[in-house]
Amino acid sequence: MRISRLILPALVLLLSAADEPQLVPDVSQREVEIQYSFTGADLLLFGAIVYPDGRRPDKPADIVVVLKGPEQSITMREKQKVAGIWVNADRARFRSAPSFYAMASSRPIAQIVDERTAAIYELGVDKLQLSPSSLNDSAELDRFQAGLVDLRQRNGLFVERPGTVEISDDVLYRARLPLSARVIVGDYTAETFLVQDGRVVAAAVRDIHVRKSGFEQFMAVAAERWSFLYGLTAIALAVGMGWAAGAVARRI
């Protein structure tokens, strides 16, 4: 009797999962190499929606894709002008701000899900959970968070493209998201969400690796493994280049 009580809920969960659609996502580049000439990349996120028994819903579903970079701890400083001089005034520290965030959706997010669902899945730069560690006042928190979002949007590190996901025949989807030239190396995630009637019914993730290559990779490895020799070499090069520039200037 006890075994049947354990098996029955598991069967119910399996049957309910079988009734939900599934996502089969992919991305055009699983690895992005950063070289000295890197000016950014344009990633294609695409895939298919698999419905149980091939039955498509009467009402078309929506797709939201989110590309996230490694999380960072960041400190924001607010400057104020005192006696004609700009000085640091207030500051705020965020423990887990994504280094990069890009989102595309088949329609504006407000038309797809409610505020609560958008906050749970972080669908939009205004829904990011940045984990502030040094602020208690909500007004200050909102001001600093808005400043961080604005700064990263101007640097191309926070991107929103509502209404740009293309869905064909209610089955195939595709979206393009830009990867800024300012991105850091690390592991990125490409998340895809399938939304029906305001509810996320399926989600899938693909990993993207951003790494340095060529001379940039050699310099990064050298700085990490042989930091002392790397520092001496950098100083020697700086002194040598300064001496050479002075010698050329004297001849001219």
Language model: regions and residue ranges:
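Bacterial N-terminal signal peptides
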Residues: 7-14
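N-terminal edge beta-strand
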Residues: 20-36
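Short solvent-exposed capping/turn motifs at the termini of beta-strands
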Residues: 49-52
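Membrane-proximal low-complexity regions enriched in glycine and acidic/polar residues
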Residues: 81-184
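Short, aromatic-rich amphipathic segments at membrane interfaces
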Residues: 178, 201-230
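Extended, hydrophilic extramembrane loops/domains of integral membrane proteins
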Residues: 182-212
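Juxtamembrane interface at the cytosolic side of transmembrane helices
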Residues: 228-231, 238-252
